[in-house]
Amino acid sequence: MSAQSVEEDSILIIPNPDEEEKILRVKLEEDPDGEEGSSISWNHLPDPEIFRQRFRQFGYQDSPGPREAVSQLRELCRLWLRPETHTKEQILELVVLEQFVAILPRELQTLVREHHPENGEEAVTVLEDLESELDDPGQPVSLRRRKREVLVEEIASQEDAQGLPSSELDAVENQLKWASWELHSLRHCDDDATAENGALAPKQEIASAGESHEVPGTLNIGVPQIFKYGETCFPKGRFERKRNPSRKKQHICDECGKHFSQGSALILHQRIHSGEKPYGCVECGKAFSRSSILVQHQRVHTGEKPYKCLECGKAFSQNSGLINHQRIHTGEKPYECVQCGKSYSQSSNLFRHQRRHNAEKLLNVVKV
């Protein structure tokens, strides 16, 4: 390869899950209009997750200068979000999905990622299926430890806001800026532990709360609380299941202290800590910690769609997909906006609707 061709290549060092490094050379060439374009074969690129990780882990020291750093970040972001093949809504869902997975407890992050969800709705379905299968769904705090419905209180009503040092005011301003995109995209976790007082429990308190649904604690961000965690945007009872108080739990996890009434449930749970994935797909080699997950995955290869709508005959590979589809026929709209009362059949539609409310709130606060 000539020196000129090397200079025209954009070289990205991408760590794979085994912490090895491989070099992807993205050849840039002139398009017919004289502008630079990419000759990337999108179908043969590695998993977008690799580029997402590299994009987030990229450091300034990884490039010779600021211009090169921006160029590398732009290319990594493009290879992750792939605007050439994804719509704006799909790109939005990828960003929402990333943030949602990031706020999950580490153990749940592992379980969600091995399903390779393509959007937030699929990630939520994974957690719902997990809770319905595990023996101890009565501890939903780990799944719902954060309120996603973020409402911004008027700064003028904060008595202490007038006396804030400039550094804290800057912190407040920065929160307003990034909240308009990052936080308001994920308003879908119903947290019984904070429904009464709107407070956010620290991770340590949540972990020790055990069976309790009332977890004390407040949001500590180093500045006065200008963010208020509002009511849930999910139907009441979501992530909940009635429990049998007489059922004793004699099996205890040595890692986290969680109790189970059946030894089989404990074995499944312990794979979260050990990372064991004994169920492998013979088609593609992917491994999973639970046989039920493997069964769902194999439908990607077989095309099997065992869940059929009795109204129109449309079939789905997962029961959750059928449930969502049936709302078209029944007219059910369980996802309600707590600010205006408008209801939707899909949580993703509610997310988009709430963005409008949150943007208006943020603009009003900035104008104060």
Swiss-Prot record:
Keywords: DNA-binding, Isopeptide bond, Metal-binding, Nucleus, Phosphoprotein, Repeat, Repressor, Transcription, Transcription regulation, Ubl conjugation, Zinc, Zinc-finger. One of its GO terms (molecular function) is sequence-specific DNA binding. Pfam families: SCAN, zf-C2H2. InterPro entries: SCAN_dom (IPR003309), SCAN_sf (IPR038269), Znf_C2H2_sf (IPR036236), Znf_C2H2_type (IPR013087). Residues 52-134 form the SCAN box domain. Belongs to the krueppel C2H2-type zinc-finger protein family. This is Zinc finger protein 24. The gene is Znf24.
